[in-house]
Amino acid sequence: MKIMKYIVPALLGGMLTLQSCEHFLDTKPTETYSEELVWGSRSTADAFVLRTYPDILGLYHDFWGDDQITLNTILRQSCPGEARDLINREHDFGFNKFSIIRRCNLIIEQASASTALSDLDKKELVAEGKMLRAMIYYYQAKHCGRVIWVDRVLQVDDEFNLPLTESIDRTYDLILSDLDDAIAGLPEEYPAGRANANAARALKSEVCLTAAAYTTDATRKKTLWEQAVVAVDAIQGYSLDANYGGMFNQENSYSSTEIILARYFSKENTNGGDTYMQTVIPNQGNDNLKKLGRGPLFKKDWVF
């Protein structure tokens, strides 16, 4: 009896311990999020979409980085090594953006397939994904002309030997198709810093003008010009801001009547240093130009 008295509680304790261990080990990763969670509500889906913006908008305001390999700015004069020696056949010149393209394709596919999102949410998110994808490929098209167009989320067993678009015209046709879908699906108004239908129209007008510049087909060129005009005429609700300086600080940037799409930085987590203006304007005075026999002279001497 004494043996049973001690064995039975021990067995029960062991069973409870094993059961506890089983639940203890049955955990989920805490540093990652499942697709079901991300696309299970509009708020979590928005969080994924908004995290995609910085990688894309940065390509549109870091223009001086590309200019360092051209003769366009003073920046090249300060980095001849980078401009000449480091820019070789191994430099991708903006071609390798496939991780960001994958995020755009995830937005399009996962939002469309979600059973938790409303039809309106799906429509807006898919359109936003296409807008972002068009922005990436337009950036690449300006650099490379022909691109590897990936319009789905690639899996490990997919064929990765993907071809370039057959022509520059085809590249721009695909970009414009995405922009047309974005215009049709995006709301007319969105919170500051997020693309709306007007932002898509504005980008479409620029894409049309760029595409027209690179086509050799006169009929296509005329059609693209006409599409650019239609896109611009359809933009409503914006006007030149009387407070120009306010657009570039917290005084007026969020409520400006001129800004269609911008990337915003908070003073709470942003440190300022060199400005883009310093890298694109020569830090020279007229006295130096005269000494070197150069001209024309600056209307405003010593900008900095």
What are these regions (language model features)?
Residues M1-A10:
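Bacterial N-terminal signal peptides that target proteins for export
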Residues I148-V153, G185-G193, L240-M247:
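Glycine- and aromatic-rich loop/turn segments at beta-sheet edges
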Residues E22-Q77, Y172, L176, D180-D181, ...:
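An aromatic- and glycine-enriched ligand-binding surface/loop that stacks and positions planar moieties
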Residues Y139, H143-R146, R152, G185, ...:
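Alpha-solenoid helical repeat scaffolds
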Residues L18-S20:
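C-terminal motif of bacterial Sec signal peptides marking the signal peptidase cleavage site
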Residues S34, S41-G58, L75-C144, F160-D173, ...:
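Conserved, well-structured interaction surfaces
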Residues R146-D169, Y214-E226:
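Short coil/linker segments at helix-helix boundaries
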Residues L12-L16:
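Hydrophobic helical h-region of N-terminal Sec-dependent signal peptides
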